[in-house]
Amino acid sequence: MSAIWGIVDFCSGQTDTQRKNRAGSLKEEALRMRQAYGTSCLDRIQEKTQEEYYLACGVQNVTREAKEEAFPYEKSEKNGEGGSLFVADVILDNRRELAQRFVSRRDLCSHPDGEILYESFCRQPRETLAVARGAYACAYLEPGKQLTLFNDAVGNRSVYYFREGKRVYFSTLLAGISCERETWEENTGWFERFFAIRDLRAVSEPRETPYAGILRLAPGEIAVFTEEGVRRSDYWDPFAGRKLLQGKTEAEYRELVTTVFRHCVEDVIREGRNGIKTGILLSGGLDSNAVAGYAAPFLAARGKKLYSFTAVPEEKERSRIPGQYAVEDERRSVELVRSFHGNLEPEYLVTNRGDLLAENRRLRELLEAPHKAVLNLPWMYECYRRAAEKGCGILLSGQYGNITISYGDFRSLFLTLLHQRRWRSLVQEINAYSRKYHRSRKWIWRDLLTAEAGQDHEAVARYMYDKSALRQIGEYEVKLSLATGVVPRDPTRDKRLIALVLSLPPEQFTHAGQERRLVRQYLRGKIPEEILADEFHKGRQGVGSRELLIAQWERICEALPETLEEAMTGENGLTRAGMVRGFYVGLAQEYRRRFEV
């Protein structure tokens, strides 16, 4: 993996003096851009500067092939003029497929990821975008003609860009562009939406940033810049031509789901130099356990361990309170996984220590934008740091799994059957649910008949490919990766899995009194049975952070004056959710003051 940045000047038809002046200013801007990456965990920087462009790539030697990258890759036309150049922040999941399908060179299979993607894109750009899988953001330059920026379909990586006059600036880090001016105008709409959303979503659209004029590639987007302007388009839409896979047997559905998901997990695990290891953010939940269920055996077959990182409270084994759904200490679940797989080496991170205000201020600068996950991001960042210290190059997770591999919701199924007027199936499903969970049938029917529109399976399916959510997750992961040198990979948001879950009938996710069936039924034998069978508890990571917030509340309010007012929620007064909101609003208002002149 890596970071990319650069400047392209489309100015033409000038005198020699004017060209020299522009080339001189471009070199000065290039130097400032390079300095913006001074604190990033990069193994080396490769760059090229000409009068009309500057292209750079900071490489991280995470995979075995990364050390052989030679950016920018370059081709000349037969007459020695024109040609193209290419820089990429890339790790491919289907290297061999691209090399053999589009390049027809078997020897290329051993070459670096960036070279494979470049050779493939040069020959068949549209087909390459349709087939390529992995985490990547790329810049393809045809000097004097156009600059093309594109990223992977699910936004694992991306790039910011800004156009001023005839110049285009692009950068993996926002600082690579913001460093080119002393003052910027704020994007008022971005802040208004940030404050208006009452949950932990920081963004509601996939392109805008806090800086007016600076945009970011949305997941699965391609942007083409010329002297005249820019053309943007989406190259992957899993909803286009979507059809449900009806009529298969239960065994066929199981085989389809397990085969696709196994490939999603195994394809992101790469061999690294110098014994680079594979880690995982592991809880007692189904998402990360689904990933571990395939990652651990895959690594064990190669004589390797899987290193897990879990946030826990300081006091060991907080007892489960009878009737309480949330489990505050997930050590017990992780130890079950360790016994089950044999090659898991867990590490526990205590979350009720530290200075929440100082940590979130530091994270705000690292993420280059206000964030809302003020309780979770500090311990997640610590997991990345610990993974780096342990020598992990890849850090697996199951962040997107709730809406893909482990999705399932009774109410959504009931409403779907109701809207489809499938009365017999609806009665059977309600009866099964009522018997298992001891819920009144009358209460269930009343709830369904008074439910608002937009809550059935079709409505939920729209979130299976949610560009705003994918952008937010990917944006945080890229910044944490550049700060620590660890590359995050989440198989639960592989585009193959997203396309698959969008094609499955609603009953595959929830049926006969059981929800989240893709994991609970189809992954039996891959996850400890005690975890699969426990439908009445859910792990709660970062419990100690909540306790820290209460203990440090007065000091936070003194440092951030807007915090207390925002935290007061009407008649309810001061609630924990209100405290979280007050905290992130106070941090965002403090960040916003940098735009004041």
Language model: regions and residue ranges:
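Structural motif
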Residues: 107-112, 127, 184-188, 453-464, ...
